[in-house]
Amino acid sequence: MAVFDFYGSNQVEFLKYLIPNDVTKILDSKRALYSPLLNEEGGILDDLIVYHLGNENFRIISNCGTREQNYACFQKVASEFDVQIDFKSDASIIALQGPNSMKNLSSLYDIKLEKFHLYQDEEVMIARTGYTGELGVEIISDANKGLEIWNYFISKGIQPIGLAARDTLRLEAGFNL
């Protein structure tokens, strides 16, 4: 996965132009919006999640395999708006998914999240999102904090799976690959 943070005074208008889904639906709180990213002809380039971080600041998480294509698309559109892009090359994303995910999360963070809502502090962003169709969260941080969180979950006996397993779950849930 690829993490992009956006800055500037015209982010909402930028996102209205960039994606077909209505970004104004998530402006009232820290929430997420699933959306396709389209090319100029309306063809799908990728699926991504847009996160409202508060104060009209946004983050997009897209697929890693399309990060360069997406970054170029973001830059092209951003040049028409007062928007700067920060590709977070040191980002860590841990997808904690499955029926016990919230219980496992609560052993580390005492938070409750509704679907497509998020929590953020100085070190992490935790979003009630995921690409598996299962109950779960995605934990985004820098690489050092991500390793700390990863090691904690491994020490608790939580089993990691790879992208192939995640992609199988995506297919079962009817999500695009």
In which residue ranges do the predicted regions lie?
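Basic, glycine/lysine-rich polyanion-binding surfaces/domains
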Residues: 1-177
